[in-house]
Amino acid sequence: MVCQALLHESSKCVPCSHKFCKACILRFKDCPLCGADIEGIEPDDELQALVDRFIDGHARIKRSHVAGTEEVTGDKNKVIYEDVSMERGAFLVRQAMRAFRAHNIESAKSRLSMCAEDIREELKSSQDNQELCSQLGAVLGMLGDCCRTLGDATSAITYYEESAEFLSKLPQNDLELVHTLSVSLNKIGDLRYYDGDLHSARSYYARSLDVRRTAVIEHSAVASQVIDVATSLAKVADVDRNLGNESVAVEGFEEAIKCLEKLKLGSEEASLEQRRLSVLDFLRKQLDDK
């Protein structure tokens, strides 16, 4: 699969000379465009420089600006900042998501890093801007996903923790923010769990559960929030069981089951009902196995 995002590490197929991202073309033995055998791959620095200039001029949130015949020297460039919620920051994120879906992770990471850098710069002059903090939290979470996919658990945890730090500063009345924050906390918990640090994993799972419990109090009619709470209860209970706290674990599983059994969904919510039944089946098996 070719990512169809802006070229990253532009590379040329030999002998046909068709050009792709390095990570994309390395998967092929034949050119995806013409079908010719690929005898070698060469970097195309000139094309990559053109792509980089396009990104700097049209895709970055910040850019240098010279008015009229104003002379610019050293670091005295006047920098204009666009609204990060507008197309410039969103463009970089879209490019990153295209690359990520096609497993061109280094490309995705590069674009997200640019976006994070620009938002950080914007925050220097607008530290209390909640929208910027929310956007940075989301971008950092995606950077964590990139590092996790690349097998760099340490960097992934660092990004997830920073994401959670920014998102935790914001009012928890936006469901999208609640979801992003709770997922980042759970992902840290997962990585700690896989590393064998169960106490740390439980701490992060419990924080995620607290965020979701608070949200469901204000949004009790939102079915997905109830399912999220049950999922978090299951994560905490699973760690409790592995720590030898069986009675506490059973209480957690039972509470999660009650949450889902009380949840009634309409016929138009088929996907949520499937998710509810899947989680419920898992929870019941945990009690059957005790």
Predicted regions and their residues:
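RING-type zinc-finger domain of E3 ubiquitin ligases
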Residues: M1-P15, K19-A49
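Flexible helix-coil transition and linker loops at the boundaries of alpha-helical arrays
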Residues: N77-D83, I119-C133, F166-V178, R213-Q225, ...
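Alpha-helical segment of the N-proximal tetratricopeptide repeat
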Residues: V79-E121, D145-T149
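"A position-specific structural signal for the A-helix of alpha-solenoid helical repeats
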Residues: E87, R94, Q135, M142, ...
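Residue register of alpha-helical TPR repeats
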Residues: A90, E131, A138, T158, ...
